[in-house]
Design a protein with these regions (language model features):
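Active-site environment of non-heme Fe oxygenases that use a 2-His-1-carboxylate facial triad
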Residues: 1-229
Length: 229
């Protein structure tokens, strides 16, 4: 969802988000800045295109929800994209079962090496995680933070094929939506379901600045349960 017409000031999303619950702090700080900077230690801090991805897949418990507050979007390019990865996974389950089963069964290693904080983080998890009832629990997919495949050599070709196919579908026009954030917009989404990205932008043509916030899924579910009563 996109909340429109919020104040265009730094940290002004806090009053909106605090009506739901408290935000989740990470090493990125809160809010984190999505802006082009010199000598970046993360691709989000560049002007490069970002493929659709989940944030922080190397965490054991990645944030459940993310909120991106647009302050300025005056550069050429920098359009946003999003894809419902549950829909893509459901398509594979119904039409390409072998690929789906591989994505469910074979864990991937996600990693982050942050030399500015002297921290190396990693976590193993499958691209598609199911509940005990077979429903979709979450999707972990971020090409930029995937480590080398760690599986049996006999499975290597099958695993590469499955993830290549999944990655292509996550950018297929049948599933993807594209839009442009305007100043004052807050793009809110389920980080474990809706993968997000952006097109390349030209920092010489204008400024682009978003502020990001995370919130745990438990906080959202708890608030929804309360409002239902």
């Amino acid at each position: 969802a996109i909340v429109k017409n919020t104040p265009v000031k730094k940290e002004s999303a806090f009053p909106v988000l605090n009506r739901i619950s408290h935000t989740r702090e990470t090493f990125f700080k809160t809010p984190f800045e999505v802006v082009n900077i010199p000598k970046p230690n993360n691709s989000a801090y560049t002007a490069h295109a970002l493929n659709n991805h989940m944030d922080l897949p190397w965490f054991e418990n990645p944030p459940g929800y993310q909120f991106l507050h647009c302050l300025v979007n005056a550069a050429e390019g920098g359009d946003s994209s999003a894809v419902d990865a549950f829909s893509v996974a459901d398509y594979l389950r119904k039409n390409e079962k072998e690929i789906f089963d591989t994505l469910v069964k074979v864990p991937l290693k996600f990693r982050d090496k942050d030399y500015t904080q002297e921290l190396h983080r990693s976590f193993y998890a499958p691209a598609i995680s199911l509940t005990k009832d077979g429903d979709f629990n979450d999707i972990r997919f971020s090409v930029a933070t995937m480590d080398a495949l760690d599986c049996h050599p006999d499975e290597m070709e099958k695993v590469y094929k499955a993830h290549h196919r999944f990655g292509n579908l996550l950018h297929d026009d049948k599933f993807i939506i594209k839009f442009r954030l305007e100043p004052g917009d807050i793009f809110s989404f389920n980080n474990r379901r809706l993968l997000h990205g952006r097109t390349e932008f030209d920092p010489n043509s204008g400024h682009r600045h978003l502020q990001g916030y995370y919130m745990d899924r438990d906080e959202i579910i708890g608030r929804l349960n309360y409002l239902k009563k």
